[in-house]
Every structure is written in structure tokens, then in C-alpha cells.
């Protein structure tokens, strides 16, 4: 079995690779886990992980430059697929960041947090949303195995996804209002938070993906 981590020059790639390989050991899987920017090699993989970090316009431009956008679209149709952070945002129709069109797997937009966010006590909240936050699982999913409700994951983002179809929302967090932070449809699962930075909970989720 082969698991490809898409390398288009945008993202915490080596940290993701290290975490997924650790998760593979925990899963007891005999799987080859590798970084690749080769569309053909990505297309031959059994599972695909799509990380991303940085500005969405730059990420989309890099994806198209390397000819990986079509490989991603093909993988979305029929392979277990895990999008992380901007890799998750790229799966939506459109982003307010740079007025950028996404890949359109999920209907909806990626929106920016308001500039004057305040908590219930009236204290101003910083944007980007950065640090640990609890995640509510709103539906059952195989990737939640052995992950308790309200587990904390690590976030770094100024934009969040707003799905058109509420049935695609698998998890939510609050900053300070609820926002979708996990979405899924068929063979595709995607998180706004960074699994590779989320310690044991992130490793468990990646292990569950490799077993999915």
C-alpha cells in the first residue's frame, strides 16, 4: 500500500511526513509513505494526504503550476483522501482570501474571521486563531475512533470554511462563535486544524486514516 503526501511546496511537509510515518507504525501498517510532487505518482497511490500552509492564492497557483490540480481532483473521486488546513480550504468552491476559486469538492466558501472578534466577556480575540482548541464531533466517523469528544487540536488560521451542506460538517470548534473545523463526504475527510501538530490526538486521527 502507498500513501502519498502531496508536495507542491506549500505546507509543513516534513513535519506531516514524520507524523504520518509515526502513525503508520502505530497502525502496524506495511505501507510506503512518501512526499511527491509528481502527478503520476500521486495518481498511483492508494491513499492521499493534502497538506497546506500559507496564502490560498499562492497554494492554488503552486498546485496548478506543478500540474497537481488534476491529480488531486482524480484522487478526490475514488481514494481515501485527507485534507489538512489550507489543503482542506482548497477543497471548497471559493475563498475570500485573494478572491480565489478552489477545487469545488465541497460546496461553500472559505471566509475570514471578523477583524473585531470578542469573547463573551468582551475581550478582543486575536486573528489568526492560534493555539489549542476543543473540537466537538457532530457526527460519527471512522477517523474519530479512540478520540474522545471535546479533544483539543492545534489551530493556526485566519480563514475558516463555511460549507453549504450542513451534512458535510463532522466537527466544530468555537472562536468565539461555532465554526466548522472538520468536513467529510464519501472518501474525503478534511480538517482545519493541524493533525501533525496535535500530538497524540493528531497521531490517532492519522492512524485511523491509514486504517480507513
Swiss-Prot record:
Pfam families: GATase (PF00117). The keyword Amino-acid biosynthesis applies. One of its GO terms (molecular function) is lyase activity. It catalyses: 5-[(5-phospho-1-deoxy-D-ribulos-1-ylimino)methylamino]-1-(5-phospho-beta-D-ribosyl)imidazole-4-carboxamide + L-glutamine = D-erythro-1-(imidazol-4-yl)glycerol 3-phosphate + 5-amino-1-(5-phospho-beta-D-ribosyl)imidazole-4-carboxamide + L-glutamate + H(+); L-glutamine + H2O = L-glutamate + NH4(+). Pathway: Amino-acid biosynthesis; L-histidine biosynthesis; L-histidine from 5-phospho-alpha-D-ribose 1-diphosphate: step 5/9. It is found in: Cytoplasm. Gene3D superfamilies: 3.40.50.880. InterPro entries: Class_I_gatase-like, GATASE, Imidazole-glycPsynth_HisH. The keyword Iron-sulfur does not apply. One of its GO terms (biological process) is L-histidine biosynthetic process. Its main location: cytoplasm. One of its GO terms (cellular component) is cytoplasm. IGPS catalyzes the conversion of PRFAR and glutamine to IGP, AICAR and glutamate. The HisH subunit catalyzes the hydrolysis of glutamine to glutamate and ammonia as part of the synthesis of IGP and AICAR. The resulting ammonia molecule is channeled to the active site of HisF. Heterodimer of HisH and HisF. This is Imidazole glycerol phosphate synthase subunit HisH.
